[in-house]
Amino acid sequence: MRKNAIAYDQLYALLRPAVWHKAVLEVATGTGQVAKHLLCSADHIEATDASAAMISQAKRGNFSSKLYFSVQDMFHLPYADQSIDVVIVCNALHIVPHPEKALIEFRRVLKNDGTLIAPTFTHAENSPWGNLQALALKIAGFPLHSRWTSAAYLAFLQQNGWTVCKSVVLQNSIP
């Protein structure tokens, strides 16, 4: 798991400048770890998840007025058009059906000069270890709806109207 901790520390270091003094929406926050790690950099973070249980867990230990957790559907966000500086969706687009529809909703809430940050695990290499982990995710209730290589994921984003300004592959124990 040390490999995961290193990868996430690298991810946080990459994200902090992008959220500096910004209004941030994190979608699919899960336990809220990304939002909590970025709290000191952002002006305000709205961290959402479709699971009430995940939001309940994420709220534990949150004493900041700059961080608000709520249950939301990433396909129907309650935020005004062009009201968010940065949308973050970490490791989630591969587990939702029709991720392109989520991208449309993210574009709606982002300001014209806003930034989408969408790191995800790439599972398409089909290694035995990757396939085993994909099966474990499915059993845990997170079936993979999309299996991308890094290049295919970037192409998916571009095909859906996004300009990729930066792409970094971080080594993690989850492929």
Task: Show which residues each predicted segment covers.
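Conserved alpha-helix/loop element of class I SAM-dependent methyltransferases that forms part
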Residues: 3-22
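Class I SAM-dependent methyltransferase SAM/SAH-binding core
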Residues: 25, 31-76
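Short alpha-helix
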Residues: 145-160
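Short catalytic micro-motifs in class I SAM-dependent methyltransferases
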Residues: 91-92
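A short glycine-rich, Lys/Arg-flanked "PGG" loop and its adjoining helix->strand segment in the class I
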Residues: 100-112
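Conserved S-adenosyl-L-methionine
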Residues: 162-172
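Conserved class I S-adenosyl-L-methionine
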Residues: 117-140
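A conserved beta-strand element that flanks and buttresses the S-adenosyl-L-methionine
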Residues: 88
